[in-house]
């Protein structure tokens, strides 16, 4: 299954996620795309890279990134689709708050989907922390809207929406997603009691709309363990209690109905066993619009803070000290003569005058 997938991370954040995945398992295909050559050079496991010609980063400017996409879309898509023509599944990866990944990914994904209708496309997107700035949140919302517009509101692709608020460090999100995704792909490893096989993994992987991957500890009550796993998950929260397909791979017999009651009721379930971890993959969930929409509230709060600070800003005009009448009279009645511009160098030592300001 792994050799059927090509990851197309765009920008620094997306590149770091896939670089982490390749560090865990080098069997995946990947083409790293960036406007910054320095970011590409910093990757540890990248075999295939594409630097946007003449670009030196986007400075979190989405419009600039969209401009690069418009100019170089043929080259970008050709690099992915021709170099990895045997791959049936193309997964774009980007952090949504920046410039390069946020701006380039939606149009390239939308175009590639139209150009290659027989391929399956996915998107791994990362939402910003609440502490990030207004522009980052604006970028993330714009990226989400562009992805929704170019993919029939998420109905044409698989989405893995991660939330940086769920962990202190972004690197923790990267490592956890990489581990979860790789465990998902390994569910078909042999077990005497049966496994979730390759065909079933393919069905889970190519199901449209949003997907989540969970792991839970079976040392405590399964519903308690799963509720905890779902609450602490790196994936953006979803509000529906249904999904299309569910994959369950556990180390022992578990109450499947208890899992469904927490994660969501599927149309079809694939059940198997493994010797290492308890994994649940829920696919075909409605995209997490509510979570993304909450960023508008964050933006409003930050703008309100800025307005309050601006309204308290100190007046920059300095009021001069008024002179008393005698001083005023002495200035007015001064007998000193004016100096014309033509004679200034004769009357004033210019070098000495300006030396006081050096």
Curated annotation (Swiss-Prot):
Top-rank lineage group of the source organism: Viruses
GO molecular function per UniProt: GTP binding; GTPase activity
InterPro entries recorded: Tubulin/FtsZ_GTPase_sf, Tubulin_CS, Tubulin_FtsZ_GTPase, TubZ_C_clostridia
Annotated GTP binding sites: 182
EC number: 3.6.5.-
Major subcellular location class: host cell
Keyword Membrane carried by entry: no
Location of the protein in the cell: Host cytoplasm
Family classification: Belongs to the FtsZ family. TubZ subfamily.
Task of the protein: A tubulin-like, filament forming GTPase; the motor component of the type III partition system presumably used to ensure correct segregation of this bacteriophage. In the presence of Mg(2+) and GTP (or GTP-gamma-S) assembles into filaments which upon polymerization are almost exclusively bound to GDP. Filament formation is cooperative, requiring a critical concentration. Formation occurs very quickly and is followed by disassembly as GTP is consumed. Unlike its plasmid homolog in B.thuringiensis (AC Q8KNP3) GTP-gamma-S does not alter filament formation.
Protein name: Tubulin-like protein TubZ
Organism: Clostridium botulinum C phage
Lineage: Viruses, Duplodnaviria, Heunggongvirae, Uroviricota, Caudoviricetes
